[in-house]
Amino acid sequence: YKLYRGEEVRGATPRFWEDVKEGEALPVMFKGPMTVTGFIAYAQGWGGLYIRANKLAWRLIDAHPGVGIANRFGIPDVPERVHWEEEFALEVGAPGAYDYGPERSSWLMHQMTNWMGDEGFLRQADCKIRRHNPAGDMLFIRAKVTKKYKEGDRHLVAIAQEAHNQ
């Protein structure tokens, strides 16, 4: 957790387009170590696609029977439990309980908004999720400016990012 101390947040200090250089590296962003508690905390904030309890869970499974996958008690449960239930994650071929892809996408944007500051505007972002980040993993996000250009009156930069575990 000590790696979070070094996180650079530009905030209200403007980053001027004229000062940006092609090839410039952004500060490395650290995320982790991955924990099941962290996976659940993300699901609490996001809401999850299928995470419901009690009567709401019954309504979902009753309306969409294929959503429910029997747990160890034979009760239909959500597929998202691969994120907090180690045995189920292993059963489906994952290396263990693992993080959420949308959260990982948000980390990439977090790095860019920290770098650009409050006055910047994130115009476009896309990413590819290629592997799981199981509990215990630590993630390091590296990025660099690949292009600096103008489109009409817009002053833009393109940034390439890669995230790797320990």
Where are each of the predicted segments found?
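Short structured motifs
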Residues: 13, 124-130
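HotDog/MaoC-like acyl-thioester-processing domains
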Residues: 1-8, 12-22, 28, 41, ...
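Short, hydrophobic/aromatic alpha-helical segments in well-folded domains
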Residues: 111-112, 128, 144
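Hot-dog-fold acyl-thioester-processing enzymes
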Residues: 1-119
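Phosphate-handling active-site elements
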Residues: 116-122, 150-151
